[in-house]
């Protein structure tokens, strides 16, 4: 039996008091004693050194689908990805099996590899989404019996996780398992094998395959159903030995922002497991809110769904509050907005930029928050040994002094570092 820990909380009231009010972002910072040296190895004693955070450890993310057409130099998408990179350090790339391998044996590995490497070249971390899902599944799987379908699913995971190892090391291994065996919108191969095996058995099979292909990968389970059913599923998976690295939480809020109380309740309930939490797919609108009677978001079909000035101000405020709540929680390691540009899914005004590429207020607000408020930039003075103590947000830092420069890291479990300035 797994020994779970209620993280920082004995009850909801205590949880909220601790996580939201006490040292709000102190858990995002660390102190490191850095020795600065020149290229010859001589300590830079009694020297002013300017240090600046250049890359957050925290994963500030967004859907990165635009990187695929950007690899061909398409102007609109190159412009979008440049704006994307000015804001984010983490992005989700599409590995939907039905798109990735429309014809059996012909995966789009080369295109996805180009996109992932393009992100890496600009300092962004790519995530693959998803390895197993009943929606967007490969139609050709339907020709096979369940045993063969499972075998091909595991082969697919082994192939793709192995091929992308070192480039993509974070994966949504399986998506939306709560609904998977009862999904009845259309017949598909993955729902078939989930019915046959059961949820926990299928989750264990696909996670074990991903872990075997890349033992160091971050492996997520991911779902939009945040009811007790998801908690029960996670509990069953962990007790079955499924190597879940982090819990994925989806919040597509097309029907209105859920607000602080509901967000804190989600954090409270999923902190129970003591695992890192990734908010993997998050949507906030800058236009008309979807009617509440819509059950499946995909059923809401409109000819156009414009962004409005009032909606853009609302979206800006909602994104800021949501980010502040999530960044304040010690177990949250990543937040990913789903659409970078309006009109990407359901034609919704859900992006941080408009369809014409102009920046919305929410883009400016998040850039201010991430790169101006949650940053560290200071000048330190070294001692006789060239050492200086630095306290700042964890991540990658640049250092400069005496017309030379270098870099170092501030990490949670790293008390000392050496920075060579050249």
PLM regions: where:
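Short, solvent-exposed turn/loop segments enriched in Gly/Ser/Thr/Pro and often Arg
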Residues: 64-68, 130-135, 172-177, 225, ...
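Substrate-binding cleft and catalytic face of glycoside hydrolase catalytic domains
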Residues: 86, 90-103, 112-218
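Alpha-helical scaffolding within the catalytic cores
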Residues: 71-82, 110-115, 155-160, 200-207, ...
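Aromatic- and acid-rich polysaccharide-binding/catalytic face
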Residues: 85-99, 103, 157, 164-169, ...
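Beta-strand-rich domain onsets/edges
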Residues: 1-45, 50-67, 90, 102-103, ...
